[in-house]
Amino acid sequence: MDATTQRQRDEFSARLRKRARHLRRWPTRRQVTCFRLYERDVPEVPLVVDRYEDHLHIGEFERPHDRTEQEHDDWLELMVQAAAETLQVPRQKVFFKRRRRQRGKSQHETVGSRGYEIEAHEGGLTFLVNLSDYVDTGLFLDHRVTRSMFRGEAQDKRVLNLFAYTGSFSVYAADGGAASTTTVDWSNTYLQWAKANMRRNGFTGPQHQFFGSDSLRFVQDLPVEPLFDLAVVDPPTFSNSKRIDRDWQVQQDYVPLLNEVARRISSGGVIYFSTNFRTFKMDESALENLQVKEISRQTVPEDFRNQRIHRCWRIVRS
């Protein structure tokens, strides 16, 4: 190990120790067993480390470096070992993913087929997470606060969850006393996962419906009447999957989507809209009969160093 790598390893380990001490009691107070420990805190170690129960999920963000491919693989393994040793997690419970810039297909890239799944807990609820097979685990930790806010508004509401992924917002809504939930995602894999998450928390019955569909097409095909009172729209930045009608780009498609949703929301109804697209620009004047308020400062959790991990708006139907 050269001197530079040793220094990077030591700085990474020191930061992990400090964060682990700082967050020692925090998860219990917040009723969570999955949270962010490290987020590129040391610039030369551009990794993200999340804890799920007694496991670690580590991701690398692409960044230029002067190592050969083999040298970089060796460097990554040293950093992964450092995290395991520092946080006293067995190496077999540490999962590493390379997170490349999105260049095609879906945001939810498949990287394996091992099927290593565990239960994670958040806000008194249980979620199935897959640590081995996808770049993402099935639970977006940066929306923990948003989910809690959504639950707080769900009592007796007819809830619509578009681009639902594994259905965590539907689970929170059902727990908040929603009259009904409608969960929509084009991926059958994630739709089945959403159903499993609902069942795990005891939410079954005809009032909870699931649809495998392109979200925009699904809404357009609904009658133009107030079918819902509360909605969440958390789309990918883009997608060009063959299973959806057309390429999706959030910046150019959000206006028609939100206007279509608004036409099916009751007066005074609420839409939560979020995006991870860093350069996204919201044009409030293009939205029909909607009062728009950005709430990103309230929705990004305190364990996230990157306060721009997402942007979020609470939109009210006039």
Each predicted region: which residue ranges?
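Non-catalytic accessory regions of SAM-dependent methyltransferases
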Residues: M1-H55, F61-E62
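Non-catalytic substrate-recognition/targeting regions of SAM-dependent transferases
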Residues: V48-D50, D74-F140, S148
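S-adenosyl-L-methionine
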Residues: W186-L230
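Mobile active-site "lid"/loop adjacent to the S-adenosyl-L-methionine
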Residues: Y190, G212-L216, D229-E260
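C-terminal catalytic and target-recognition region of SAM-dependent MTase-like enzymes
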Residues: G269-S318
